[in-house]
């Protein structure tokens, strides 16, 4: 059951920003490296196949992918010059802009929506007694990964609005980082 407090962040640091390393993308280079953190349990570039195909078509660039295991590694690949492009969430983009000279040039917009943004859901088991957002105090909480905008930062912001913090041991019985959005549901 999805608790009804569905959160939409519009025009905030945009959903999964596609960023361009502020280097020279000139005609001499044949292939550009795109770094990504797997978006699903499958964990391969098929998560980004459509994005890569569209980017290649619109820009004329050839793109190879570099898979990394976490957001910090994606930023570091850009900072070190091993990647030219990345698909980041808002929190990671801010870090990449600061230390890797990343520059946003596009944002993902879901089909049927006018603005870039994303949703964060708090999910409980079907027969759970948790019916309101405030009911989560003292329970076990599973988040995505440290550094995830939709799976870590925004849930913490929303919890703080009701005076709960994952850092306060009295607020949650246990807080887990599951490693992916899918794994949070297990």
Model region roles, listed by residue range:
Residues 2-12:
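Positively charged n-region of N-terminal signal peptides that target proteins for export
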Residues 50-91:
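N-terminal, post-signal-peptide region of Sec/Tat-exported proteins
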Residues 72-86, 99-100, 134, 179-186:
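Short helices/loops that flank or line small-molecule/ion binding pockets
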Residues 96-109:
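Ligand-binding "clamshell"
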């Amino acid at each position: 059951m999805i608790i009804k407090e569905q959160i939409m962040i519009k025009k905030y640091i945009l959903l999964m920003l596609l960023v361009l390393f502020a280097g020279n993308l000139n005609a001499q280079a044949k292939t550009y490296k795109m770094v990504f953190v797997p978006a699903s349990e499958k964990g391969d570039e098929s998560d980004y196949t459509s994005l890569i195909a569209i980017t290649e078509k619109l820009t004329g660039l050839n793109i190879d992918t570099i898979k990394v295991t976490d957001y910090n590694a994606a930023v570091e690949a850009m900072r070190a010059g091993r990647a030219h492009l990345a698909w980041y969430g808002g929190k990671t983009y801010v870090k990449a802009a600061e230390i890797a000279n990343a520059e946003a040039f596009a944002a993902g917009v879901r089909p049927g929506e006018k603005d870039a943004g994303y949703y964060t859901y708090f999910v409980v088991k079907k027969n759970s007694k948790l019916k309101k957002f405030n009911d989560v105090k003292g329970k076990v909480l599973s988040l995505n990964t440290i550094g995830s905008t939709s799976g870590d930062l925004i849930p913490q912001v929303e919890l703080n609005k009701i005076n709960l913090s994952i850092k306060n041991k009295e607020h949650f019985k246990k807080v887990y980082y599951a490693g992916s959005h899918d794994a949070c549901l297990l």
